[in-house]
Amino acid sequence: PASAVSASVAADLVARAVSERPSACAAHFVFANNRLLHAETPALPEGAVCVPIAEALASHPDLLRPHFLRHVDFLGGDKFAALHAASTLSGIFVHFPKGCVSTDPVIVHHFVGGDGAAVFPHTLVVAGEQASVSVFDLFESIDGDEETLIVGMTDLDADHGGRIQYAGLQDLSDKGAKHVQLQHTRAGRDAAVKVGFVNLGAEWVRNESINRMVDKGADCQIFSANLANDVQEYDQRTLQSHEAQHTTSDLLFKNALYDGSRTIFSGLIQVQPGSHHTDSYQTCRNLLGSDEAEANSMPGLEIDADQVKCSHGSTSGTISDEEIFYLRARGIPAEDARKMISLGFLHEAVEKLDGEPLQDFLFARVERKFAAIG
């Protein structure tokens, strides 16, 4: 459903991706319309596997098959998951075995273009015992206002003491592009997984994030910063499932909305029977930059265990006149003042991710989006 790009376009996309990548990297892959355009592994640790999904099916089937397309639970996105499973052609398999550690991220660019183009990238990350890996996905449009569709899936599996950080940036065209991202986490004993999403583009977005803490000491942190304007709609569904004693999780979603944009947040903390001594937190905060913007939040709790500490909540508000007055008194125009306050509002979520180069890259994209908002 997506045509290959020309050689000249491919060269331009690779040059763009390499020049814009946020930091030194363990590996870098560039896909356009499901085709692999570029691959390099300048600092991949010994023993690590980092290859396209299609290659992994042939070269590392024993490592891939226990994890690939194994999830059957979704938060309403079952039909998208079935479409993805039937159509996925691109994406990356990252496997860090026991004790394998890298401080540099694996960076994957996914470009889509051509009217009616659809791509189905899959990111599968496995961290063995005491391994540590970071992966950064970027989703971008090749051209302008074309009708395109991305249905992606991200699966994260951290074994005993494993560490995974996953960040996803969606910066597609806000005219015609639609993006669905279905993410699953399985955190084992004493494992730590950190997941971050930044949504800036696309006309319509559906994010589902299911995070399961399945053994003692597991921890998941989930963060999202979203900037919507015009008629963009961001639909976010989350599940924090505590399935063992002494597990922890923390979720922070922040949405800044302008014009007639709309966000939906539906999140659930679920503490399974016997999962005592759980600590879990869920917060969604919405900043409304116009009277027409609409933010809908539905946080929830289901607790079937004793001796737990859980909280959930959501707030929605506008920028106060006092804040604007304070900045205007210091020579800052009112519109610039509003953008500064909104930038600071979103920064709290972005800075939760590890790695200053990654934070700087994401925040620069947020600033670029603000500059484009009239």
What residues fall within each predicted segment?
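Conserved beta-strand/loop scaffold segments within soluble protein domains that form the structured core
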Residues: 39-49, 53-332, 346, 350-374
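Short, Gly/Pro- and small/polar-rich lid/capping loops
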Residues: 1-34
